[in-house]
Amino acid sequence: MKRLLCLLLLTTLTGCETLLIKNPSAQESEVTSATTNVDAVEGDKAKEEDSGIIDTLRGRNDPIAGDPAWAPIHPKEKPEHYAAATGSLFNVDHAQDMYDDTKPRGLGDIVTVMLAENTKAAKSADAELSKSNDSSMDPLQVGGQELQMGGQYNFSYELSNDNNFTGNTSANQSNSLSGSITVEVIEVLSNGNLLIRGEKWLTLNTGDEYIRLSGTIRPDDINFDNTIDSTRISNARIQYSGTGDQQDMQEPGFLARFFNVAL
């Protein structure tokens, strides 16, 4: 009996210890997933979960702050220019040439994106169709006399048909987005281009507003003050939206959406 109790106690302690000690490979996988280049619009669909009946009625899944897919980048190794403090006023490792720049070039460096998106679209079309048909036949004559039926009707007819169609349509759409967001370099490509990704969350009263951005930039397009225009980003994915009560009031309910589709 004592041996059985000791065995159970040992098993329990071992299980608790297993829960406390985390597998290093699991930590590595979490870091890898955190540094994945995720689309700013689509998000990380691999980890989407059902948020309950409220989100089902809303018809959308709101993103959350602190998503591991958008976590900051933390380089494991120290940068090449890093050096321990020696107490000297001059350190060659911290020296910067007069003609050198401080543009982001490595993993984890930051750059500020100036949002200046303006798009306009206008389209119109006019169509006009018309068709006219006329057909007639003179009365039949036999021996110089009209051939009649019953003394009242002759064999003649006259037909006319007119068809007219006029249609016009027009569509106008414009979008504007201005502001700024600071993002991080998550990968350096072989040609020197930089993959960037970042998000900004603002808590305002009863809801949150967020901006997410990802894309590819060239170091040459970065300005001297470490900023770059959003129009210089290749494969840009920009998402600006919100969550909470104010966002819910801007969208129709699920019954309204159902009848809009059904009817």
Swiss-Prot record:
A lipid is attached at residue 16 (N-palmitoyl cysteine). A lipid is attached at residue 16 (S-diacylglycerol cysteine). Transmembrane segments: none annotated. This is Flagellar L-ring protein. Pfam families: FlgH. Keywords: Bacterial flagellum, Cell outer membrane, Lipoprotein, Membrane, Palmitate, Signal. InterPro entries: Flag_Lring (IPR000527). Residues 123-143 are annotated as: Disordered. Assembles around the rod to form the L-ring and probably protects the motor/basal body from shearing forces during rotation. The gene is flgH. Residues 1-15 form the signal peptide. The keyword Lipoprotein applies. One of its GO terms (cellular component) is cell outer membrane.
